[in-house]
Amino acid sequence: MGLPTLEFSDSYLDSPDFRERLQCHEIELERTNKFIKELLKDGSLLIGALRNLSMAVQKFSQSLQDFQFECIGDAETDDEISIAQSLKEFARLLIAVEEERRRLIQNANDVLIAPLEKFRKEQIGAAKADSQIGREHQNFYEASLEYVFKIQEVQEKKKFEFVEPLLSFLQGLFTFYHEGYELAQEFAPYKQQLQFNLQNTRNNFESTRQEVERLMQRMKSANQDYRPPSQWTMEGYLYVQEKRPLGFTWTKHYCTYDKGSKMFTMSVSDVKASGKMNGLVTGSPEMFKLKSCIRRKTDSIDKRFCFDIEVVERHGIITLQAFSEANRKLWLEAMDGKEPIYTLPAIISKKEEMYLNEAGFNFVRKCIQAVEMRGITILGLYRIGGVNSKVQKLMNTTFSPKSPPDMDIDIELWDNKTITSGLKNYLRCLAEPLMTYKLHKDFIIAVKSDDQNYRVEAVHALVHKLPEKNREMLDILIKHLLKVSLHSQQNLMTISNLGVIFGPTLMRAQEETVAAMMNIKFQNIVVEILIEHYEKIFHTAPDPNIPLPQPQSRSGSRRTRAICLSTGSRKPRGRYTPCLAEPDSDSYSSSPDSTPMGSIESLSSHSSEQNSTTKSTACQPREKSGGIPWITTPSSSNGQKSQGLWTTSPESSSREDATKTDVESDCQSVASITIPGNVSPPIDLVKKGPYGLSGLKRSSASSSLRSISAAEGNKSYSGSIQSLTSIGSKESPKAIPNPELPPKMCRRLRLDTASSNGYQRPGSVVAAKAQLFENAGSPKPVSSGRQAQAMYSCKAEHSHELSFPQGAIFSNVHPSVEPGWLKATYEGRTGLVPENYVVFL
């Protein structure tokens, strides 16, 4: 029930009813006054809490900003660099949100506190002061009229002067929340890419951990005196008997022995309570040439595990004491002592070795033939192992001395898992790995290079340095793995997954150490490069001018060229976002990012909930030298025929793999997903936003992006593409027509530098969202030496580009090594022009 009205005529009568109605208004104003006081108090507490929260978040952000990741090994993968930089990205994002919160707090006093306080004091207070009118007898009627007018005025002004400040404060609060929403939208692509990096790193960690754990268990179960091979035939601590005036003393020495030169070295290494270096006292090493070694008779000395040696430089014998009987046997064996030569414990002895002979080649070919004939689309091919007893039976049957070299494999007798496990077991048990110990370090150094192009060229050259049989076997195997990867839509065995499985098998380290285990991730990359660049590596001669890999120190500059969030001023959103960095800056070119292993469910939460409207682009597939041409594979769901499925060229790499001179174009990361009821056209995954996927320059044709399909029932996606594309919308996507002026589809990559993760922003906290556009023309091959006309004008952003007006005529137009760009001549000057800016005449 509302307040009764106050009539001016009633004020002259001053009736009891008028007094009662007037009192109702005064009581309401008093209640409003108390409420505003409480509201101001609570508002001050809210602002104080926001200020404390802001300070806490800023301190948290600073902690994230200051922390520095360090990784094991002398080089880092792009995944590790991205993950190491992620904390700084989180810090920048939080700082951007806190900047908006700071503005909210600064304006809160002017928007909320001051207006309400002013209204309470000036309006309600004035009405309360007028309540003294009862005591005034002079000019009673005139004052009464003014009082009634004031009461009415305050009651009406309360409706807007009281609520308006609250609305302004809430508007500011919602502006802050909207800013957080925009930042979350902007952060989503980076978050997805970081999830890819994390999943990829986790898979690498799992494979590395298994190898390290296996090595640790072998060391635990083996005799503690087992020592991996090194530059010395034998080394370790021994006690040396030294004569003293009153008897003998035993001094601990660190001794080494080289069997080839027969040089024996002793370095004093004894612990003194008052010595320096934490009690460790070391002396200069003494070197001797060994003459003979003999075991000391047990009853001739009161010490155990002793043996005597004679050296050229000293007269008499030197008595040494080992730590155990097994350790003494190893020393005697190394020095050709008069003890029998004992072998290493059986548990660490090598498995039965295989060889690259006729039987081995036949076995590999038969296994591959069986897999390709009946099981190349089986889910988890090569990842899921067979039963050990069956695998061992297959190996014993095939490689038995009585078996002929060309023995057939009965595919009815052996299941697919047993055959694939047998193939891996054969390669794993070779006396020397297929890539050889000699070239192992060279391959590792090659893929540690920051230069993506050099990686491929160096691996190409090193493969041709392999022995003929090794290269022939590698050719057979990699050709098969390429076929397997082309069916990753069904078997989920992407190039990245195959690299994880066959990397340690083909590039087994000679020394089983933790340091060698840390290089497993680079072994995987070598295999990925071999698969993706199969045609070039095995069917073309390497460039003789490519220098062989040289050992290099860990680069400290790679991490500085990482993802960055600018804190510049806000700019309005445009339809298309232009270049995100200066042409000469490191951030202008994007380095390869890695893509994760194939997983059906991982990172798929964004696939079906984003973008009810899809903007798309069609890029021109091109067949490049050393690569596999783009193919279109029909796929269907429940009998419903779907659109052709674009698959990316294996020439682009999946993790840190280098591209050739023809660096993969952004537009080659096009993929199409078919869902019953709605079909989306190919989508350009390149988002030129602050967290856009421009960092996928090379990983655009990642093995994980090789193929995508969506089943009607569960909408499961092969590979890990699902969280990258976000296409599976619940509503039917609609294509947006071509804009008048398309942006340059493919930013040129500078081949002389390799920046890290290329997520740039054009100077704003909430940058312009990535734009996708549709190319109505069908893909046409680019011919050499033709004329072309410019459809749009263009201003050069780099010294190697051409500036030209609309309608300009180009001559001698032919493809360039830059993806998405053509080389042309205009007005006597030759340079690069965007491929989608011109039409051939």
Curated annotation (Swiss-Prot):
Q: What is this protein called?
A: Rho GTPase-activating protein 42
Q: Which parts of the chain are coiled coil?
A: 191-227
Q: Which UniProt keywords apply?
A: Coiled coil, GTPase activation, Phosphoprotein, SH3 domain
Give the organism, scientific name. Mus musculus
**One Gene Ontology MF term:** GTPase activator activity
Which terms in the GO cellular component ontology are assigned?
Answer: cytoplasm
Residues modified as Phosphoserine: 649, 707, 720, 723, 778
Q: Which domain of life is it from?
A: Eukaryota
